[in-house]
């Protein structure tokens, strides 16, 4: 999993510019593994902590900009609204266009969750099944690639947390 990436917009701020301005601008999502407000009203989360540590390393304040969707992360970054993204994003070919990803900090696997008793062994076993996938997730891109080999493969994209 990749947590930080920098924009390739015209006004990229490198470490020197960030230090001069005194603030690291970070885009993120409200998510239990990324950035959220706990019961004490504190903002916490693994990627939030990593971004805050990077800001400390630079000797600057950190400003978090929370958006609702992965698409908004990419669009806001491309528009220069932030210096980087900290949101547990999976790197895909489509997502790599126009941005630079950091080295991965964690490897994750894509899994299919089925009802008890159903155990697909290969992508062809998914043909004819009702598949639901979260909007904006890397699963959509994977399914689009699998559809080239299995044209009858279909799925529905759903909104909300996935």
Write out the residue ranges for each language-model feature.
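Acidic, polar ligand-binding/catalytic clefts
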Residues: 33, 48, 52, 56-125, ...
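Bacterial signal peptide processing site
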Residues: 8-11
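Short glycine-rich His-centered loop
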Residues: 21-45
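Pocket-lining segment of extracytoplasmic ligand-binding domains
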Residues: 111-162
């Amino acid at each position: 999993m990749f947590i930080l990436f920098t924009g390739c917009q015209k006004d990229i701020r490198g470490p020197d510019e960030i230090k001069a301005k005194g603030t690291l601008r970070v885009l993120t999502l409200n998510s239990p593994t990324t950035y959220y407000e706990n019961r004490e009203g504190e903002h916490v989360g693994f990627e939030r902590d990593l971004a805050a540590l990077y800001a400390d390393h630079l000797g600057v304040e950190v400003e978090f900009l929370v958006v609702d969707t992965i698409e908004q992360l990419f669009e806001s970054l491309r528009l220069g609204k932030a210096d980087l993204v900290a949101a547990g994003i999976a790197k895909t070919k489509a997502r790599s266009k126009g941005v630079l990803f950091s080295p991965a900090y964690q490897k994750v696997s894509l899994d299919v969750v089925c009802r008890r008793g159903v155990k697909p062994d290969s992508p062809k076993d998914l043909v004819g099944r009702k598949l639901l996938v979260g909007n904006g997730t890397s699963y959509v891109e994977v399914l689009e690639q699998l559809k080239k080999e299995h044209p009858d493969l279909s799925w529905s994209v759903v909104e909300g947390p996935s």
